[in-house]
A protein has these predicted regions:
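Conserved alpha-helix/loop element of class I SAM-dependent methyltransferases that forms part
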Residues: 1-10
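Short, well-ordered coil/turn elements that cap or connect secondary structure elements
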Residues: 8, 35, 85-87
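SAM cofactor-binding core of SAM-dependent methyltransferases
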Residues: 11-71
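Conserved small/polar residues in nucleotide/adenosyl-binding loops
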Residues: 104-106
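S-adenosyl-L-methionine
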Residues: 56-102
Length: 106
């Protein structure tokens, strides 16, 4: 992880567009390797269907032992904070970020 995170024990991440879940998956793997607590929030207006996400082979190419985690990232409920591991929590918001921001006057 970049030097700006040296000495940090916890990081909050905001991702705009969950998409295939690759960024979330890579961040999860780093959190486990580095022992760093990550609170990961992602907004997605158009989630991919299970038919598509089940065909993604990122775990097989990157971390075969974590295939079940990749599946969990896609299967966990939207709009609920989920502890994927003791070091990684995920909040997937099925929402239009532009509408959300307008509601809080940003």
């Amino acid at each position: 992880m970049p030097g700006i995170f040296i000495g940090k024990k916890e990081i909050n991440v905001l991702e705009i567009g969950f998409g295939t879940g690759l960024n979330t998956f890579l961040t999860f793997l780093e959190s486990q390797e580095k022992g760093l607590r990550i609170n990961y929030t992602t907004f997605e207006l158009y989630p991919l269907s299970p038919d598509i996400t089940e065909k993604l082979n990122y775990p097989a190419l990157i971390a075969p032992s974590s295939e079940s985690i990749f599946a969990l990232l896609h299967q966990c409920e939207w709009n609920q904070k989920i502890a994927i591991s003791p070091l990684f929590t995920l909040y997937k918001s099925h929402a239009d970020l532009t509408r959300t921001l307008s509601l809080i006057h940003i």
